[in-house]
């Protein structure tokens, strides 16, 4: 039986929903930085292909970790506040800073890499977009990932090319990864059609990652 993580439920479910209720009551616009790590590839969403991505209306289908289960419930509940809450789904956030929260820094410090094509979010691309959405009091759900897919190996190959030519890494399978992790990892392709209609200037993920690596420090 899976142990209930009280902090997870408090921080990722009760907190956001209570904030949504309070802001709705007071007429205050609320922007919530949620996650797209509530989906996984399946028969309708083929592995590693940029087709039939998960849309803003898609229901969570990933239950591989307690974090994603709780976040999935929160995401669906926020659809009840579409007139007052902006729910932004981000994934695997990337910046040009060498810090432990940066996805690039994380994977360059892993002993082994399970390389899977994924949708990801290059945060500096979205800072002005988030501010614009807040200023215009936009509401509803929006997939906030750069268009396209990129794998861990593609990022590490660029890292070796641009940052450290001596960098090396080893790969292992999803099955091997699952044996050593407490929870499974979400892997998916997010549909960004809605985002691209609103902000057609947004860069594809591989171009933005390369830009981050050129400034990585």
For every predicted segment, state its role.
Residues 3-18, 37-88, 95:
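Catalytic helix-loop patch of NAD(P)-dependent Rossmann-fold dehydrogenases
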Residues 126, 130, 144, 155, ...:
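Non-catalytic, hydrophobic alpha-helical segments
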Residues 203-217:
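Amphipathic terminal alpha-helices
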Residues 25-29:
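A short helix->loop->beta-strand "cap" motif at the edges of active sites that frequently abuts
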Residues 11, 118-121, 150, 190, ...:
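Residue-level signal for the nucleotide or nucleotide-sugar donor/cofactor binding architecture
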């Amino acid at each position: 039986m899976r142990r209930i993580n009280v902090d997870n439920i408090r921080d990722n479910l009760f907190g956001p929903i209570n904030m949504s209720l309070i802001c709705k009551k007071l007429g205050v616009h609320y922007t919530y930085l949620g996650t797209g790590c509530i989906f996984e590839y399946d028969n309708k969403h083929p592995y590693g292909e940029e087709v039939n991505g998960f849309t803003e209306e898609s229901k969570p289908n990933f239950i591989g970790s307690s974090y994603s289960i709780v976040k999935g419930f929160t995401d669906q509940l926020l659809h009840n506040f579409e007139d007052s809450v902006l729910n932004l789904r981000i994934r695997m956030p990337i910046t040009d800073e060498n810090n432990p929260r940066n996805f690039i820094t994380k994977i360059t410090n892993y002993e082994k890499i399970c390389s899977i094509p994924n949708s990801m979010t290059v945060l500096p691309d979205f800072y002005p977009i988030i501010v614009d959405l807040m200023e215009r009091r936009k509401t509803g759900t929006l997939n906030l990932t750069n268009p396209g897919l990129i794998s861990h190996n593609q990022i590490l190959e660029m890292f070796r090319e641009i940052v450290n030519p001596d960098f090396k890494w080893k790969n292992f399978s999803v099955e091997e990864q699952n044996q050593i992790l407490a929870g499974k990892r979400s892997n998916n392709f997010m549909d960004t059609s809605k985002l691209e209609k609103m902000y057609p200037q947004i860069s594809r993920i591989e171009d933005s990652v390369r830009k981050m690596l050129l400034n990585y420090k």
